[in-house]
From Swiss-Prot:
Matches recorded under InterPro entries: Snake_toxin-like_sf
Record-given protein name: U-scoloptoxin(05)-Er3a
PTM text: Contains 5 disulfide bonds.
Similarity comment: family membership: Belongs to the scoloptoxin-05 family.
GO MF annotation terms: toxin activity
Tissues in which the protein is found: Expressed by the venom gland.
The keyword Signal is annotated on this UniProt entry: yes
Any one annotated GO CC term: extracellular region
Subcellular location: Secreted
Main localization category: secreted
Amino acid sequence: MRSWFVFVALLAVVFLPSSLDALKCIQCDSQPNRDECKTTLPEARDCPQTVNNYCFKTETFNKNGDLSMLRRYCNVLASTQNGCVDLPGGLGKKCEYSCNTDGCNSVTGLVASRAAYLVTLLPIIFYALSRQ
């Protein structure tokens, strides 16, 4: 009985905070010839309650392939494309990515999810339970 209590408590620690906390996303806009929002990023901030379902990263490239605009923000809906599309008239392309874990719209986009923590934690839990 005690082992199941420990197991349920650990699961709650892993999953409960994500449902209580607001999603934290990098929120910034690039300016021409400036580094902010490209590689120098602000801290991830709580998304407003009305748009706290997904983090977005939107990149716009000109016809020469140079990055002309970059936005990182919160949104209520996931991206319908999650990739790049050509802009009309051969003016360049627009790339859109959405994700739903804290800070996932950062430069690398490599942020461990709660599932990754759980996969790491489960063998430890089962080992501890089997030793009792």
